Amino acid sequence: MTLLFPLIASEGGFGINLNLFETNLINLVIVIGVLYWFLKGFLGGMLERRRETILKDLQDAEKRLKTATIELSKAQEELSAAQQKAEKIRLDGQARAEAIRADGEKRTIQAMAALKQDALADLTAEGARLTEQLRREAALSAIDKALAELPNRLDSKAQAKLIDSSISNLEDV
């Protein structure tokens, strides 16, 4: 053992000194007691103030958390309401666009039908006018031809016979 601890062996061994004055135990107790007595108020007050500050900060944080939670809930409700309103507006817009499109198609079809009827009426009127014009021209041509041939065919006897038959036809009526 002396080989391991040469310093201990040179001092004469390992032991505890129980003499209070040599170990300064009384001085240490007095210094520690005085430090405890003086620092108790100072450190205690400092720690108490720190504890109160921490508690106040925690209470403020809890209040802010509750307020933030309430505001978040309100904001989520408002967001939900806004999304519902936006969806309603979108659906209304689609319905309105569909109604406008259908109305436009209906008006276009009606306008096309009216144009077709007008064109048909114009075509019918033009056909009737052309038919009437052709009749007049045919009648005028026949009259001109008859007038041109009439003097050669009618002599005075034929004229008298024609006049008599016309008068008898008029009397029957």
From Swiss-Prot:
Membrane topology of this protein: Single-pass membrane protein
UniProt superkingdom: Bacteria
Main location: membrane
GO cellular component term of the entry, any: plasma membrane-derived thylakoid membrane
Stretches that traverse the bilayer: 25-45
Any one Gene Ontology molecular-function term assigned to this protein's record: proton-transporting ATP synthase activity, rotational mechanism
Subcellular compartments: Cellular thylakoid membrane
Any Pfam family matching the protein: ATP-synt_B
Keywords, alphabetical: ATP synthesis, CF(0), Hydrogen ion transport, Ion transport, Membrane, Thylakoid, Transmembrane, Transmembrane helix, Transport
Transmembrane is among the record's keywords: yes
InterPro entries, sorted: ATP_synth_b/b'su_bac/chlpt (IPR002146)
NCBIfam families from the UniProt entry: PRK07352.1
Assembly mode: F-type ATPases have 2 components, F(1) - the catalytic core - and F(0) - the membrane proton channel. F(1) has five subunits: alpha(3), beta(3), gamma(1), delta(1), epsilon(1). F(0) has four main subunits: a(1), b(1), b'(1) and c(10-14). The alpha and beta chains form an alternating ring which encloses part of the gamma chain. F(1) is attached to F(0) by a central stalk formed by the gamma and epsilon chains, while a peripheral stalk is formed by the delta, b and b' chains.
Annotated function: F(1)F(0) ATP synthase produces ATP from ADP in the presence of a proton or sodium gradient. F-type ATPases consist of two structural domains, F(1) containing the extramembraneous catalytic core and F(0) containing the membrane proton channel, linked together by a central stalk and a peripheral stalk. During catalysis, ATP synthesis in the catalytic domain of F(1) is coupled via a rotary mechanism of the central stalk subunits to proton translocation. Component of the F(0) channel, it forms part of the peripheral stalk, linking F(1) to F(0).
Family: Belongs to the ATPase B chain family.
Entry protein name: ATP synthase subunit b
